[in-house]
Swiss-Prot record:
NCBIfam families linked: PRK11650.1
Keyword flag Transcription regulation: no
Record flagged with keyword Nucleus: no
Reaction catalysed by this enzyme: sn-glycerol 3-phosphate(out) + ATP + H2O = sn-glycerol 3-phosphate(in) + ADP + phosphate + H(+)
Boundaries of every ABC transporter domain copy: 4-235
GO MF assignments: ABC-type glycerol-3-phosphate transporter activity; ATP binding; ATP hydrolysis activity
Membrane topology of this protein: Peripheral membrane protein
The species this protein was found in: Shigella boydii serotype 4 (strain Sb227)
Keywords of the record: ATP-binding, Cell inner membrane, Cell membrane, Membrane, Nucleotide-binding, Sugar transport, Translocase, Transport
GO biological process: carbohydrate transport; glycerophosphodiester transmembrane transport
UniProt protein name: sn-glycerol-3-phosphate import ATP-binding protein UgpC
Length: 356
């Protein structure tokens, strides 16, 4: 096992525009880090740089305290699992898992032992003689992971490995990946555009946008204290409500562009008069009453999800989503009186988009 360090790493295709801005990341020995972000944010490019498949423009990459920036991929001590399984169709499961070790010149006995152990871990024991065409999608992905495991790498690199699986199988494979990491404790860097994968698998999440690491933290930290408007809007389903307005002159209320005033939990006097964006998650808005000082919202539509419901409405031109209990099913056009939990409000600078 080994740690991984990226030190002010950048990437430019033309020598002018940086698609990866200077990025530093320390991954502890045995840690599971997930890079998440929209398509084109640079997460797969960064993973390929760690793998040695893309050249680093500036900066350094270290694995197990060894600088590997210019080192060939085969010499870095990494194993990669891709979105496409990349299995040899004419080989059996056993042969696919053993092939990489065979071309490296490892002895037959040692290869057999490693394949047997990986097959046991991944519950592939009874499938070793089958061809890929005889396997399900989940089984093929386990074979791809087994091929990586037998190499006993310093670092696992996962490039959206579950993207080709259906929704039910993705849930199963997420659980299997969690169990696999708990057992192997190998340093892992995982790329996905799926925030559910990121939040369920990661010990720490790196949220990327436009080649920049917007925030690095535990799933709880990223969810509860988003560092920027982008993180607030990207993490969470449904997304955080983001309302534009200004802090009043006394710093006690947030005045929405539509004229509604929302109470603030003190400490915002230094932002008095400034344009800001206020964020609150749908589950932190609760039903209240006019007598209790609730803020009215005329409901447009209701999404019935089973375990709970989502009420959609507007304050002026600004959309608001409220998560309601299963038994709460107001009709369209009805007025909801709402209370926003003041200790769950998030304020973001109107110019920079950064959390204040």
């Amino acid at each position: 096992m080994a740690g991984l360090k990226l030190q002010a790493v950048t990437k430019s295709w033309d020598g002018k525009t940086q698609v990866i801005k200077p990025l530093t990341l320390d991954v502890a020995d045995g840690e599971f880090i997930v890079m998440v972000g929209p398509s084109g944010c640079g997460k797969s490019t960064l993973l390929r740089m760690v793998a040695g498949l893309e050249r680093v423009t500036e900066g350094d990459i270290w694995i197990n305290d060894q600088r590997v920036t210019e080192m060939e991929p085969k010499d870095r001590g990494i194993a990669m699992v891709f979105q496409n399984y990349a299995l040899y169709p004419h080989m059996s499961v056993e042969e696919n898992m053993a092939w990489g070790l065979k071309i490296r010149g490892m002895g037959k006995q040692q290869i057999a032992e490693r394949v047997k152990e990986a097959a046991r871990i991944l519950e592939l024991d009874g499938l070793l003689k089958r061809r890929p065409r005889e396997l399900s999608g989940g089984q093929r992905q386990r074979v791809a992971m087994g091929r990586a495991i037998v190499r006993d790498p310093a670092v696992f690199l996962f490039d959206e490995p579950l993207s080709n699986l259906d929704a039910k199988l993705r849930v199963q494979m997420r659980l299997e990946l969690q169990q696999l990491h708990r057992r192997l404790k190998t340093t892992s860097l995982y790329v996905t555009h799926d925030q559910v994968e990121a939040m369920t698998l990661a010990q720490r999440v790196m949220v990327m946008n436009g080649g920049v690491a917007e925030q690095i933290g535990t799933p709880v930290e990223v969810y509860e204290k988003p560092a920027s408007l982008f993180v607030a809007s990207f993490i969470g389903s449904p997304a955080m409500n983001l309302l534009t307005g200004r802090v009043n002159n006394e710093g006690t209320h947030f005045e929405l562009d539509g004229g509604i005033e929302l109470p603030l939990n003190g400490g915002y006097r230094q932002y008095a008069g400034r344009k800001m964006t206020l964020g609150i998650r749908p589950e932190h808005i609760v039903l209240s009453s006019q007598a209790e000082g609730g803020v009215p919202l005329v409901m447009d539509t209701l999404e019935i999800l089973g375990a709970d419901n989502l009420a959609h409405g507007r304050w002026g031109e600004q959309k608001l989503v409220v998560r309601l209990a299963h038994q709460e099913r107001p009709t369209a056009g009805s007025t909801l009186w709402l209370h926003l939990a003041e200790n769950q409000l998030h304020l973001f600078d109107g110019e920079t988009g950064q959390r204040v």
